Amino acid sequence: MSPMDRGYTRLLLLAAMLLALPLAAQWFDYPTRGVPRTPDGKPNLNAPAPWTADGKPDLSGMWRAANRLPCDGVNRVCGDLPISAQFGNIGAGVEGGLPYQQWVRDRIRQKGPADDPYTRCIAPGGPRMHMLPTMKKWVQSPDLLIILDEYNASHRQIFLDGRPLPADPAPTWNGYATGHWEGDTLVVESSGYRDDQWLDAAGSALTSTARVTERMRRVNFGTLLIDLSVDDPKAYTRPWSVTLRQDVVVDTEMVEAICAENEKDVPHLNAAPRQAR
């Protein structure tokens, strides 16, 4: 079974757990201020991207992963949480797949969903946050971009105040991130990740040698593109890049979803690795 196939198999198992989280029907119904609308009152997602008072593109808003799999019971468990192909395998669509080091290939073959830090209630770190089916609220100021995730009340900080990226930051799940503007694109550099991270449900790795670059651009009101580049010689034979798309979500708010409250699903996940191989 290929890494992509394993990713999709594990995706189905993870989705079963995710469906225990608050569903869309339970999300709040609050109108979002400042949303451009068509004459019939619907959000105009193709309207120009907003700008901040200090002349920068405004990335603020509620976002979630695009490129969602069809709800056919095979590629995706049917439910209200929209699962993307890249959640199962970040290299989906990359010709030839990701350039794994052999130990990563071995891990993908040997490990299962119960080994994924995400299924053990550990908040997904760094770029994996972009692929989650849960909603993320981006809050942008001149000196800081904060990404709030409704899953486990987690957050990520991206410093925009001109500070350099530390040479050897303490390893964390989210790493240490700094950003600067190049025209209408926010360029984010990050490092300082833990060695035991997964980038997707297949088990693609991110280690302490990783240097991650995210080029974030809001192409219109409704679409955010993130060109993600990973240079991690411990896990990959060469650098690689993918594009992650985010869709804006309006007229709602985040709902608290604490993983430990769904720990009744863990016994099923513990039995899943042998079935997923």
Describe these PLM feature segments.
Residues 21-277:
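PEST-like low-complexity, intrinsically disordered acidic/proline/serine-rich tracts
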Residues 10-22:
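Bacterial N-terminal signal peptides
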Residues 1-13:
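Bacterial N-terminal signal peptides that target proteins for export
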Residues 4, 16, 30-31:
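A general, composition-driven signal for non-globular sequence regions
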